[in-house]
Structure formats: structure tokens, C-alpha cells
Regions:
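Inter-Walker segment of RecA-like/P-loop motor cores
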Residues: 5-46
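Hydrophobic "anchor" residues on beta-strands that sit immediately upstream
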Residues: 20, 53-54, 92-94
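Short basic/glycine-enriched coil/helix segment immediately N-terminal to the Walker B
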Residues: 41-52, 88
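Walker B catalytic acidic pair
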Residues: 57-58
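Residues immediately C-terminal
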Residues: 61-64, 101-102
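Flexible beta-alpha connector loops of hexameric P-loop NTPases
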Residues: 66-73
Length: 191
């Protein structure tokens, strides 16, 4: 089993929970080398693993945008992950993520967690499970209460009139907004 995550921080958190070393996606699947212009060149490694399950956490952060470039850079990070994993002998991929988290940069949706997209784009049989029991938050948590409320409103596409009452939750505090339009800066400084 190989544990992967998009960022160093998410790999470290994953390692802590699983008590097994996790790597960034880039470290596992790409070779890097300096080219003569001082930039880094990336090339896809050969997957030498056999009968290995690759678990990619925080997959909502994995981009699917392709570019007009050539070779490796005309493909998305998800393209490269799938190409790398399935090039190994009998290797499998488990994608883990939260569909309610922010999508990748320059994307409106996290397609890496979208069954239809994955099935159509990569011609793979997709099996998915959605977990609905929270285990890392206190049942009486205000954060959990509002996160659940927001998730439900997103599913129902009810984006209007979202209001929060902070009373009764010890883990929430009201912070007054600051309007920067009323702040003025001095026009000169004394030396």
C-alpha cells in the first residue's frame, strides 16, 4: 500500500493517522531535474510496484485541467496519477476526498471525485462510497452543526439567506468585521 496526498502538509497528516509514511503525489510519480535554464523538468516515473493499492487522500485538490503544452504538461495531474498507477502490474487506485471542500485552482468542481467523469474520461469501473458519520468532531460542536447545515444547503442548492446563530456553542465566537474602506494611511512619514 502506498499513501499519497497533494501537499506535504496533507501527506504529513495522513502519515500521522495511518502510522505509515505518506508521500506527495509529485514525489512518488515524477522525476525532477534542473534544466539548463534553471527551471525544473518533470518526467513520469516508471511504476515498478506490483499488486499495490495506491491511496490518494485530499483528492478534491487534484486538478483535471489540461494545457496546450506538449508531453507531460499537456496532461492534468489526475491524468498522470492514473497513468502512473495503472502502468504497474495489477495496481489499484483508491481516491479519498471530501466533495464539499474547495475544488482545485481554476476549477468550479472537483472532477477527481466525480464518478461519471472518472468513468467516462478514464474508461474505468468506478465504485464509490460516501461516508456520512462524523468521527473527528464533538457531537455538540458548533463547527459540525454549521458544516452539516452548509453541506445540506449545497446539496439542495439553497444559497440564499444563510444565517448563523452563535449562541450555545463554546467552539464558536463572533468576530466583528473590519471595513478597510474607512482606514486611512498617512501620506508622509517622519524620518
Amino acid at each position: 500500500m502506498i499513501l499519497l496526498a497533494p501537499t506535504g502538509r496533507s501527506a504529513k497528516v495522513l502519515s500521522g493517522y495511518c502510522e505509515k509514511e505518506a508521500f506527495t503525489i509529485h514525489k512518488e510519480i515524477f522525476y525532477t531535474k534542473n534544466n539548463y535554464s534553471g527551471n525544473l523538468d518533470f518526467s513520469l516515473k516508471v511504476n515498478k510496484h506490483k499488486d499495490t493499492l495506491f491511496i490518494v487522500d485530499e483528492a478534491s485538490m487534484i486538478g483535471t485541467n489540461r494545457s496546450e503544452g506538449v508531453g507531460l504538461f499537456s496532461q492534468s495531474l489526475l491524468d498522470n496519477v492514473i497513468k502512473y498507477v495503472y502502468s504497474g502490474f495489477k495496481c489499484k487506485l483508491l481516491i479519498v476526498g471530501d466533495s464539499a471542500q474547495l475544488p482545485p485552482i481554476k476549477s468550479n468542481l472537483s472532477y477527481s471525485l466525480n464518478d461519471e467523469y472518472l468513468s467516462k474520461e478514464y474508461d474505468k469501473n468506478i465504485y464509490s462510497v460516501e461516508l456520512d458519520q462524523v468521527v473527528r468532531q464533538d457531537v455538540n460542536s458548533g463547527i459540525l452543526s454549521y458544516a452539516t447545515s452548509i453541506r445540506e444547503k449545497i446539496e439542495l442548492k439553497e444559497f440564499h439567506d444563510i444565517k448563523f446563530k452563535l449562541n450555545g456553542f463554546s467552539d464558536l465566537i463572533r468576530v466583528e468585521a473590519v471595513s478597510y474602506t474607512h482606514l486611512t494611511l498617512p501620506t508622509s512619514y517622519a524620518v
